[in-house]
Every structure is written in C-alpha cells, then in structure tokens.
Design a protein with these regions (language model features):
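Tight coil/turn sites that cap or link beta-strands
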Residues: 1, 28, 93, 150, ...
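Beta-strand-rich solenoid/repeat architectures in extracellular/passenger domains
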Residues: 1-21, 36-61, 73-85, 94-95, ...
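Structural motif
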Residues: 148, 202, 225-226, 245-247
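A motif-centric signal for short, conserved binding hotspots located
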Residues: 222
C-alpha cells in the first residue's frame, strides 16, 4: 500500500464520479484526509469545506473503500451511492479514525464495517477498528455505523470537535456478529430512527462509559436482544441513556 494525504492546497477534491470501475478512493495503505477542494457555496454544495461526494454507478459505490488506515481530520463525505466509508474483505485488521469532519447523506451506512461484498464467507478473525475522537455521522439512509465486523470506540477528545451520530435512518450503531464490539464513551447519539434502535446490540458486546449520551432517538435508544447485557464502566455524571429490551422499554 501507499500513503495518501488529501489537503485543500494539494488536490481538487473528488466530486461527481460516475461509471468508475471501483469507487472514489480505494485505500490499501494510509489515507489522511485533511481536506479536499474548497468549492464555492451553491444550492448543490452549501459549504466551502472539502468534499468527497456523488460517487455513483461504480462497482462498489462508496466514497472511500478502506483496507488500511483512514484518518479523517476534516471535510465532508456525502451523497455517495453505497455507504460513505466501507471496509472490504481483508486479511488483516483495518482502521478508520475520525478526528473531525462529516460523513452525511450517503445511501447506506455512514461507515460500513461489513467485509462487503462477501461477508458470509469472510473470515471472522479480522475486524475494522472504528475510533471516533471527533466529527459527525449524520443523515445517512442506513445506520450511522454498520459494525457487523466492527470494533467501535467512541472517545470524544474535545468539546470543540464533538462526536455526534445523529439523524440517521437506520439507527446509529448496529452490532450483529459475535465478534463485533462497541465501547461508547463521551459523545452524543441522538435523533436517529429505524433499525432495532439507535444503538442495537443483537450480538457481540457493548460497554458504556464516560459522559455518553444516547437519547432523543425515535423508537429505542438502546436495544438489547434477549439474553444480551451491557457493561457500565465508570459512567460520568453527564451520561444519559435510554434502554429497550425485547420485552421491556425503559425511558
């Protein structure tokens, strides 16, 4: 793999890609996204922030396919045909680190740690590490994070760049395989709808810590499948959590 650095001064960004054989960016090394292209604000792009968007009619359709390490510090990944950022079949763990920026308005998940396109035959020995230190995942048609093959950590580093997973239509974080995990600390999960719940623990394990906020979602805030439990580890005074089991709802 190779290292890629995208900054506002070094690239024209990636926008409106059609009929490409793969995707917007296929990363097998290290991809540091500090920026892209600063577009003039318009009705189509009401922002002057860096953009990777409108990756359509490609083989896979996401803005970024990651098989290495993707570090996102700023910018927007939006409007892509199949997921904003997606891990694929790999023979080692891959890593997605969000320090800032926005993943929004994509068809499918904001981040898909699913080993697509063949999750049923992919080895369960390798997972995508998704570390949320800052930034926003919002308004995607699927989950904010589909963590079937994911190990998610939410640990907001600064109130100046908060972690927010909000207004996604397929829930916020979905855990569906025995090896999937989430350790959710300081950050906010709100305004999500659809799925079994904003944070849905169907399989795997879930730990809540710090000033985690899971509230204000449509339907369940925190869903636990029958027999599943959640670990509470040093919750802060600012923590806010609502829980739903298969038979009982707790506001």
């Amino acid at each position: 793999g190779v290292s890629i650095c995208m900054t506002s001064s070094e690239t024209d960004g990636i926008r409106d890609v059609y009929n490409h054989p793969v995707c917007g960016i296929y990363n097998c090394g290290t991809f540091n996204m500090y920026g892209g292209c600063y577009y003039q604000k318009s009705s189509d792009y009401p922002t002057d922030r860096p953009v990777i968007s409108n990756i359509r009619n490609t083989k896979y359709g996401p803005g970024v396919i990651n098989r290495g390490t993707f570090n996102m510090y700023d910018g927007i990944i939006s409007g892509n045909e199949r997921n904003g950022v997606m891990s694929t079949i790999t023979r080692s763990d891959d890593t997605i680190n969000l320090y800032g920026g926005t993943i929004t308005g994509n068809t499918g998940a904001g981040i898909a740690a699913t080993h697509w396109p063949m999750p049923s035959i992919a080895t369960s020995d390798y997972y995508t590490n998704v570390n949320l230190y800052g930034g926003t995942i919002s308004e995607n048609t699927g989950a904010g994070i589909d963590a079937a093959y994911g190990r998610v950590t939410m640990a907001q580093q600064s109130s100046a760049i908060p972690v927010e997973i909000k207004n996604n239509k397929g829930g916020a974080i979905s855990l569906t395989r025995d090896g999937s995990t989430a350790n959710l600390g300081t950050g906010t999960i709100t305004g999500n709808s659809g799925g079994k719940g904003a944070v849905a623990l169907s399989a795997g394990s879930l730990t809540l810590t710090g000033d985690v906020k899971i509230t204000g979602n449509t339907g369940a805030n925190l869903y636990l499948a029958s027999g599943k439990t959640v670990t509470l580890d040093k919750l802060g005074s600012g923590a806010q959590i609502g829980v739903t089991t298969e038979s009982t709802a707790v506001p």
